[in-house]
A protein has these predicted regions:
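Alpha-helical transmembrane segments of compact multi-pass small-molecule transporters, enriched
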Residues: 39-45, 100-114, 195, 199, ...
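Membrane-embedded alpha-helical core segments of multi-pass
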Residues: 13, 17, 77-84, 104-111, ...
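Membrane-helix interface motif
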Residues: 50-56, 164-177
Length: 292
């Protein structure tokens, strides 16, 4: 059960990373802010992977074609998911953007059943539907809540893409070295972030060089986002190498109250009592899905 505290730590680092990324969103835009976590996270991910490789007894690496395919697919999906999540946060609020991303639980169930042949119980499906209903009510536009056009669509797209890339990363980690999940996960993070840095950095260099300039200007804040992003990814990948994605995502719902606290302290955002109630309903649904 060590994957549970690992997941809790991953959720905390992820909230810190999202807050740091959101702070550079204005000048760099969603794609520039997305590059922050990969470009400035890669040095930290490389150090983490190197240390893990050195301290792992008898590592047996298998960088096979399925490993590279899973890494490439997951990397592309995560880039799109991160940009969609930041767009949702920018058009609504930090906490609501994070809550919308949690719709990835239901998407994870759908992808698992359709693409990976997962056998899903009735309780798990019910929990997924309850969680989705709670999130829909939580994020429904209200008079006192700023919600610009496209926020919900971007948030749901983020959840769908994150759910699919999580399964890709789990497959990559298990393929690389299933006997050493932590080391395998950290090496996978390094490879994925290198691919993402090259792909997104090259894209911005050609299409939007001004965004690259803004990212470089915000290097102090970006270093914090990079470290937190590399730490969060390493912990998430490790937990998913030890346990199914659905269970990890269920425990990771702790990210929602953490995001609400962060949004209140850092961005002066507040959730209403009704939103908090529906947030709890969503959390109950997530727990049902995990325990089903």
């Amino acid at each position: 059960m060590i994957w549970i505290p690992i997941t809790l730590a991953a959720a905390a680092f992820q909230v810190a990373r999202n807050a740091a990324q959101r702070s550079v969103m204005g000048g760099a835009g969603p794609w520039g802010a997305t590059l922050v976590r990969f470009l400035f996270g890669l040095p930290f991910a490389t150090v983490f992977a190197g240390v893990a490789w050195c301290v792992t007894p008898g590592p047996s690496a298998h960088a096979s074609a399925p490993f590279w395919l899973a890494c490439i697919a997951g990397a592309a999906l995560q880039i799109c998911a991160t940009a969609a999540q930041l767009t949702a946060m920018h058009r609504s609020s930090f906490a609501l953007g994070t809550a919308l991303q949690q719709s990835g639980l239901l998407f994870a169930l759908v992808w698992g059943a359709l693409l990976f042949g997962d056998k899903v119980s009735a309780m798990t499906w019910t929990g997924g539907l309850v969680a989705t209903a709670g999130l829909a009510a939580l994020t429904w536009p209200r008079g006192g809540t700023p919600m610009r056009r496209g926020a919900v669509t971007a948030g749901l797209a983020s959840g769908a893409a994150f759910a699919l890339c999580a399964n890709c990363f789990r497959q990559a980690s298990l393929t690389f070295d299933p006997a050493h999940p932590a080391m395998s996960a950290l090496v996978t993070v390094m490879v994925v972030q290198a691919l993402q840095t090259l792909a997104l950095g090259g894209f911005l260099a050609v299409r939007n060089p001004d965004a690259l300039v803004e990212v470089v200007k915000a290097w102090r804040r970006s270093l914090g986002a990079g470290f937190c992003g590399a730490a969060a990814s390493g912990l998430w990948f490790t937990a998913m190498a030890m346990s199914p994605v659905g269970q990890v995502r269920a425990v990771g719902v702790v990210e929602m109250p953490l995001a609400a606290l962060a949004g209140r302290r850092l961005f002066a955002e507040r959730l209403t009592a009704v939103q908090m109630i529906f947030g709890l309903i969503a959390a109950v649904g997530v727990a049902m899905a995990a325990l089903g």
